[in-house]
């Protein structure tokens, strides 16, 4: 099974080798026919501490690295 890849924006880089990435998805409500935006935060591994708040990044699924980290940053 291929690993999922998501696009998002770094919202926090306070922890060592970890960034928090906010990923937004858009969908049409089935009844209201209105476009709705929802966002979800993922904690991702950043080995070189290269990414700062506001950077656009791509994250990919990986094996669990800690209790909450299951993603790694692959590009910006």
Swiss-Prot record:
This is Small ribosomal subunit protein uS17. CDD domains: Ribosomal_uS17. Belongs to the universal ribosomal protein uS17 family. GO terms for biological process: translation. GO terms for molecular function: rRNA binding; structural constituent of ribosome. Gene3D superfamilies: Nucleic acid-binding proteins. GO terms for cellular component: cytosolic small ribosomal subunit. One of the primary rRNA binding proteins, it binds specifically to the 5'-end of 16S ribosomal RNA. Coiled coil: none annotated. The keyword rRNA-binding applies. Part of the 30S ribosomal subunit. Pfam families: Ribosomal_S17. InterPro entries: NA-bd_OB-fold, Ribosomal_uS17, Ribosomal_uS17_bact/chlr. PANTHER family: 40S RIBOSOMAL PROTEIN S11 FAMILY MEMBER, SMALL RIBOSOMAL SUBUNIT PROTEIN US17M. The keyword RNA-binding applies. It comes from Dinoroseobacter shibae (strain DSM 16493 / NCIMB 14021 / DFL 12). Keywords: Ribonucleoprotein, Ribosomal protein, RNA-binding, rRNA-binding. The lineage of its organism: Bacteria, Pseudomonadati, Pseudomonadota, Alphaproteobacteria, Rhodobacterales.
């Amino acid at each position: 099974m291929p690993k999922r890849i998501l696009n998002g924006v770094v919202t926090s880089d306070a922890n060592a080798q970890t960034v928090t990435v906010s990923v937004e998805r858009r969908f049409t409500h089935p009844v209201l026919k209105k476009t709705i935006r929802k966002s979800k935060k993922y904690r991702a591994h950043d080995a070189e501490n290269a990414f700062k708040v506001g950077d656009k990044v791509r994250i990919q699924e990986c094996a669990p690295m800690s209790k909450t980290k299951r993603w790694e940053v692959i590009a910006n």
